[in-house]
Amino acid sequence: YTEVDTLSLHDALPICNQYGGVLNDPILLRISQDEFWFSLSDSDIGLYLQGVNHDNRFNVTIDEIDVSPVQIQGPKSLALMKDLIGDQVELDNMPFYGLAEAKVGGRDCVISQSGFSGEAGYEIYLRDSTLYADDMWNAVLEAGKKHNLMVIAPAHHRRIQAGILSWGQDMDNQHNPFQCNLGYQVSLSGKGEWNKTADYVGKEVLEKMRDQIRAGEKPYKLQLVGLSLGGKPIEEYAPDFWLISEDGKEPCGFITSPWYHPEQGRNIAMGYVPFDGTLSKNGFPIGKEGTKYKVHLPDRKSTRLNSSHLLIS
């Protein structure tokens, strides 16, 4: 929903492509005056973008490029990045979602202060990655030695705590932006001020839904919320959704992403519960804090859940 002509050079903003349902939640990077990259989540959006421009209404070329990302995340990420790229980029002054060009392992890269953790972190986009992946990768490992760098999959408890969604796990094209807490991305200002005049795919549907929500109607049944979950620490990613109910009755929703949070000393999760019409001060749908549910685990006893507001980073 981002108006791309407002993006600065070497800047980036999160956007969400949708047509009623969310097709993808990429980051849009403006590399130069007339060059934009979509850093995609777990769905193929290239053919969709080409389809939007099937009649050549926009004077653009849409194609997949030979670029691959690597993330450096965590409290030591700044120090590691300084060792990795030296003074090529003023990292201390780089804003969140800021972009810069740099060489890593002697290869051309784009650096973005962003990531999938909710913590301090950076993403390295390697150009011509099929040719130079080893050069970049080995340089990262070498710079990370003194920082005790670990090569791991995403730390899900971090992104769950920060309210960072995983497409295909927490939402997909069956969900609209409002019910998965992305409604703020639809408005121009991000503060609930719907003053965007430019057209975009799904605008009529979403603006109608916005009006229904503000009028106290419920255009959908389930709302994504943050949850705290009792019981033993969850040590493995859930292979399927866990159903939840009110007081052991028929299932009324489901958990999408559960994980143990070591600092909080409890299990946290995201899940869909019945939408009761509760809105934030900016007019966006949220869950009602303190509502209790039961989770139904396969071959295990049910466990109490306490719902709270989903923390949006």
Predicted regions located by residue number:
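Short beta-strand and beta-hairpin "edge-sheet" elements
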Residues: 23-26
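Single conserved hydrophobic/aromatic residue that forms the stacking wall/gate
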Residues: 1-11, 305-313
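Acidic, proline/glycine-enriched N-terminal capping motif
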Residues: 8-15, 21
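Conserved, structured C-terminal
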Residues: 29-306
